[in-house]
């Protein structure tokens, strides 16, 4: 899978509510009502990611969960990352 160009990534961003492009990855931080709500969201995203064999980096800080997407094997953001960002929005809400 090819790394997307800057133009392709910029074109995808308006459809990725809550996501930003930072440090070569797509990132979204979400503050949940409680720690356990955040953990539940991580579990749901993890199950979906496992089924797609495309796994986000996930950072958990009390009620704030940050998802980061980059295809490490390709060295950048690919269509799989854009698709997974959309999927995560569908799972946790945009």
Swiss-Prot record:
Reactions performed catalytically: (4aS,6R)-4a-hydroxy-L-erythro-5,6,7,8-tetrahydrobiopterin = (6R)-L-erythro-6,7-dihydrobiopterin + H2O
One GO molecular-function entry: 4-alpha-hydroxytetrahydrobiopterin dehydratase activity
Gene3D superfamilies, A to Z: Transcriptional coactivator/pterin dehydratase (3.30.1360.20)
Keyword tags: Lyase
Catalytic EC class: lyase
InterPro entries named in the record: PCD_sf, Pterin_deHydtase
Listed CDD domains: PCD_DCoH
One GO-annotated biological process of the protein: tetrahydrobiopterin biosynthetic process
Keyword Lipid metabolism: no
Key word Transcription present: no
EC id: 4.2.1.96
Similarity comment: family membership: Belongs to the pterin-4-alpha-carbinolamine dehydratase family.
HAMAP family: Pterin_4_alpha
Name the record gives this protein: Putative pterin-4-alpha-carbinolamine dehydratase
Species in which this protein is naturally found: Mycolicibacterium paratuberculosis (strain ATCC BAA-968 / K-10)
């Amino acid at each position: 899978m090819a790394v997307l160009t800057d133009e392709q990534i910029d074109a995808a961003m308006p459809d990725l509510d809550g996501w930003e492009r930072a440090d070569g990855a797509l990132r979204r931080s979400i503050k949940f009502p409680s720690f356990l709500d955040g953990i539940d969201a991580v579990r749901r995203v993890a199950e979906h990611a496992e089924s797609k064999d495309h796994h986000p980096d996930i950072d958990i800080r009390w009620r704030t969960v940050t998802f980061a997407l980059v295809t490490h094997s390709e060295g950048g953001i690919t269509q799989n990352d854009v698709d997974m960002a959309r999927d995560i929005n569908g799972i946790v809400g945009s």
